[in-house]
Amino acid sequence: FYISQNYSYAILRPLQNAILARGDQVAWFLEGSEVNTSYLLANEIQLNSVNAVNKYQADVVFIPGNVVPDFISGIKVGVFHGFNSGKLNRCGFEDHFNIRGCFDLYCTQGPNTTLPFIELAEQHQHFSVKQTGWPALDPLFDLSKISKNTKPTILMCSTFSRALTCAPHLFETVKRLSEKGKWKWLIQFHPKMPTEIVEQYKSLESESLSFIETDNVIPLLQQADVMVCDTSSVLMMFLMLNKPVVTFNNISPKDYMVNITDEDKLEESIEYALSYPAELKTKVEHFISDTHPYVDGKSAERVLAAADELLAGKNVAKKRKPFNLLRRFKMRKKLNYWQL
């Protein structure tokens, strides 16, 4: 497992469980300063250098991030770090579909991402595509963990980007609503959220509001009745539980969201979402079938089957991956690895 962010642990652990269950081995390589070794469990193996990674001789490297070095062994399988939330890259294209020439296989989540990736595979011809579902969601569908709340519970999640985040805009409104005590608030932000905003929300902690720092958002998703969000892809994970989301200034609002552009509308929008009208519920269900139709908790097994297929010489791309000289140099410099 090649990771560079703390949220990767929760994405890959269902895959780790499936690998270990069939008697195979797993090791972790942590790249950069934004991923904490403290999140590793006692029984998890860490490889501390690129030399150790290559000595390990992995058959498959699973990556939830966007890039992976070409100079480590194993076929490279992209499993994504979230859903396509419509975020655009610097060139104005949807970042979810940015082909960087690093992967042999993309394991897609559902029809609305599989079809574009199949088109891209036909265009580039140096990677394969298999629809598997997203392993990160496997624990989400453990119905025994779904909470029965005595008080309506609102989960607020926000991305860190200044252009997209709802956190600074909604602070005063969330403060006022939490002081009312009508709902229970859970606040969880992207790990890159500016410290000053984190401290602001931590100052609101009370019987009605908890600020939670975690590498695993799934228990929070299971606990909440409604999510308040912006353009963070975590909102799509919440929708998979067939629960409503209120978004603030979403860059690509859809009919399965309750989107607002005025913070004064937050309270009434949450009330509307809590009532979960049939029309909204139908739209959410259509979104689920198009985005991630699997609710069996077995996406990890499907990812492994897709990797096995590639290792067996099936579903192989027609061409080799591009040379990517500049990207290769950047990765070697980043990891300070110059061996051939």
Q: Could you say what each language-model-derived stretch is?
A:
Residues 268, 274-340:
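C-terminal amphipathic helix plus adjacent low-complexity
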Residues 67, 72-78, 214-257:
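A donor-sugar binding/catalytic signature common to diverse glycosyltransferases
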Residues 1-141:
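Active-site and donor-binding regions of nucleotide-sugar-utilizing enzymes
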